[in-house]
Structures are given as C-alpha cells and as structure tokens.
Amino acid sequence: MAHSEFSPSQLHRIISCPSSVQLYHDLGVYNEVAPSSLYAEEGTLLHSYMEKALFTSDLSFIPDAEHRTIVKAAAEYVRDFIPKYTQNVKILQEQRVEVPDVPQVYGTADLILYIKDDEVPEACELHVFDYKFGAGVWVDAEDNPQFMAYLLGAVKAVNADTRGKIFAHVVQPRSSCGESKPGC
C-alpha cells in the first residue's frame, strides 16, 4: 500500500519541522518499505481482531489470552458508542480518508461511526476512533494533528452534517490513564 508523504501520522513531525519533508526525499525514505517490528506486527494483528470483535462477544477466535483481554476492553469501549436500534448509522472500518482539497494528505482511520439525525441536524454525531495498542506512549486526541486530519477526512467520507457533534477517540487499552482521560 502506498503511503502519503504527508500522512496524518506524520503531521506532528511535518508541522514541527517542515524541512523534514525535503530531507526525507533526499534520503529516499519515501521510496523505502518501512521495516516491520514485533510491535508493529502485533498492532496489525490486534487491529484485525478489532474488525471482528466489534460485532461479536465471542472472542474465542483470538488464540492469545492477553490479546483477548486487550481487544475485549477496546471493543467494549467502542461498542458503547454504537446505537442499538437506528437505521441512520454508518460504520466504516479501516477507511481511507483524505483531507478535502489536500489529496496528498491521506491516511486510514481505524473506525468511523456516523449517527445521523435527519430531523435534528445538531443531534448528529461523528466519532473517529484510532486504536493504539502499545504500552509505552500516551497519545492524546486533543490538539493532535493526526486526528485533525482524520476528522476532516471522516467528515468528507460520510458526508457528515457538521452542525452536529464531532468526537475523536484514541482507544488505548494498555494505558494506565484511568477513567479521567478521554479515549481510555
């Protein structure tokens, strides 16, 4: 899969150091396939489990007990936002999103949930979820350039009514942030 040189996950670096884009070009970074790590492979595996886990409580398809626990916590958090009986819900998993009018800024949102209310547009809700399965670094959704790009792209992807509410969720089941931090 081709990666954007202005991918949402790189925007923090690019905003902090715009010349890094040229440096990465000069070093040929954009032409290389990024090396994988055990952590990246585990994250990819857990993301694939999440795609299935959102729609079932039976997680026996996950062979590892620790992974089952992590995915269960993440799936339960996300499921709390999915309304039970409504026809006006869009759920998009692993959705490519791009910033409107800036097509070189694109990435993949883990989950977009759009709850539309035709009668009361202000009651519409757009939720964008990003799964972070690592244990080391806390990622905040607030003032996060990656999320700003995902949110703009999600509005476009579902043609969201922007008079409603828009939420960013960083789902970090391995964090020890407690209930006071949004996105736990």
Where do the PLM segments sit?
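Extreme N-terminus of proteins, especially the signal/transit-peptide cleavage junction
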Residues: M1-E5, E122-A123
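Nuclease catalytic cores
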Residues: H3-F55
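Short amphipathic alpha-helical surface micro-motifs
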Residues: H3-E5, V71-Y77, A149-L152
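A general structural signal for short secondary-structure junctions and capping/turn motifs
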Residues: S4, H12-R13, P83, V158-D161
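A non-catalytic, helix-rich entry segment at domain boundaries
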Residues: E32-Q95, P100, P182
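Mg2+/Mn2+-dependent nuclease catalytic core
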Residues: N88-C184
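Short, polar/flexible loop-turn hinges at active-site or ligand-entry regions and domain interfaces
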Residues: V29-S37, D58-F61, A135-V139, A157-N159
